[in-house]
Amino acid sequence: MAPTIQTQAQREDGHRPNSHRTLPERSGVVCRVKYCNSLPDIPFDPKFITYPFDQNRFVQYKATSLEKQHKHDLLTEPDLGVTIDLINPDTYRIDPNVLLDPADEKLLEEEIQAPTSSKRSQQHAKVVPWMRKTEYISTEFNRYGISNEKPEVKIGVSVKQQFTEEEIYKDRDSQITAIEKTFEDAQKSISQHYSKPRVTPVEVMPVFPDFKMWINPCAQVIFDSDPAPKDTSGAAALEMMSQAMIRGMMDEEGNQFVAYFLPVEETLKKRKRDQEEEMDYAPDDVYDYKIAREYNWNVKNKASKGYEENYFFIFREGDGVYYNELETRVRLSKRRAKAGVQSGTNALLVVKHRDMNEKELEAQEARKAQLENHEPEEEEEEEMEAEEKEAGGSDEEHEKGSSSEKEGSEDERSGSESDREEGDRDEASDKSGSGEDESSEDEARAARDKEEIFGSDADSEDDADSDDEDRGQAHRGSDNDSDSGSDGGGQRSRSQSRSRSRSASPFPSGSEHSAQEDGSEAAASDSSEADSDSD
């Protein structure tokens, strides 16, 4: 331990009698304090103790019932600061000669672009293709930018440009002209690219609907990775994937998934044999497929929201290009295997082909009718209805004329009968006045009664002639009706054939006929499609 050295001053301080006496602390109170005892020292060190009471009970403010019941007066102006004068109209008239405040004048001034003569601003707008712009780091690029157009002026400009660029067909004639122009443009030869003048076509082929395969609905299946098995590659993998099948399945928990099946070796041999013998399938053979992968699926079709039409093209050498519709888009993603759940890796798909039933054939005919468009157009339907109405109106007028003639003949006949009755009465009165015998008078009365009840012979002949004329007119009217009906049917058949020929694609009739024949052959060949489990 190091020695302690004590100085002389320290020794003297130690021997002083008042060395241990502490001086009283000076009070901070201005007035004289009677009792000036100082507080004792803290007997122990401070400790943190949890305060058990609510700390807000001394500072929280609660309004009393007197304050709550008091209603404060809201002192406002009677007009609430809005001076309305309904009598004097000059109250709100603005004086055009009033002097504006200098601050308001600056706001109303037009922006005058100062001439930028600095070299930096002139070189600023240049775009260097190999240099990347860094707008997200600094705003230097926009600092010297000059906007020649004000935002107030550009309101509605994009809408106006859109209307000027797009041709709007407001009337029926312009629509017909535009439709006919599309047929004319399709017949023009293509000499160069629409946007690249140096690009010229090597081969020009017509584009038609695929009449052969349109009857079969097609779907686009998108895999998240290559579905080919890992142990095969090259041509063998492509051959297996070209004959693969996907089927919906359900596991033990009731979850649905899509299974991807690949053909076994025996099935590949059978398919190769069928291809060499140029047949679709052997009626008695059974084709086996083993499960390879399991997927989750996401389907979009025409009934889905946000569906976009999608088409694919088929190039046939020496024939042309044909397009078909993709009705469904299926996205497949790999399914994760769950712990404790047995996977269906040992599943086997057994396929046996059969002929198509009536329901499937009707569905194919309905799809084929989409291209042929048997239904007449609306305009032709209106023309047919107008012609039928005209034919019906002429028949009605003819019937009305015959009925009016008949009524006229009946009126003439009733008039002649009334004249005869009056003449007979006059004769009878003359005879009675002349004093003839009672026998002759009785005979005349009997004859008159007979004429009134049965009519005379002349009247019966007139009635027979008029009835014959009416029957002839009725027969002629029915003949006219049948003729008009046959004419209407001929017009209907002609309009249907005209609409059918017009709705077809713009190619010659011979090609159309051949396409339809090919479509029928495809329907005949496709009638031997696979089972519903092997679509």
Swiss-Prot record:
The modification Phosphoserine is found at S117, S456. Keywords: Coiled coil, Isopeptide bond, Nucleus, Phosphoprotein, Transcription, Transcription regulation, Ubl conjugation, Wnt signaling pathway. Residues 361-374, 389-434, 442-453 have a biased composition (Basic and acidic residues). One of its GO terms (molecular function) is RNA polymerase II complex binding. InterPro entries: RNA_pol_II-assoc_Paf1. It is found in: Nucleus. The keyword Phosphoprotein applies. One of its GO terms (biological process) is protein localization to nucleus. It comes from the Eukaryota. Residues 1-23, 361-535 are annotated as: Disordered. Residues 502-511 have a biased composition (Low complexity). Residues 352-400 form a coiled coil. PANTHER family: RNA POLYMERASE II-ASSOCIATED FACTOR 1 HOMOLOG (PTHR23188:SF12). Component of the PAF1 complex (PAF1C) which has multiple functions during transcription by RNA polymerase II and is implicated in regulation of development and maintenance of embryonic stem cell pluripotency. PAF1C associates with RNA polymerase II through interaction with POLR2A CTD non-phosphorylated and 'Ser-2'- and 'Ser-5'-phosphorylated forms and is involved in transcriptional elongation, acting both independently and synergistically with TCEA1 and in cooperation with the DSIF complex and HTATSF1. PAF1C is required for transcription of Hox and Wnt target genes. Component of the PAF1 complex, which consists of CDC73, PAF1, LEO1, CTR9, RTF1 and SKIC8. The PAF1 complex interacts with PHF5A. Interacts with POLR2A, TCEA1, SKIC3, KMT2A/MLL1, SUPT5H, RNF20 and RNF40. Interacts with UBE2E1. Belongs to the PAF1 family. This is RNA polymerase II-associated factor 1 homolog. The lineage of its organism: Eukaryota, Metazoa, Chordata, Craniata, Vertebrata.
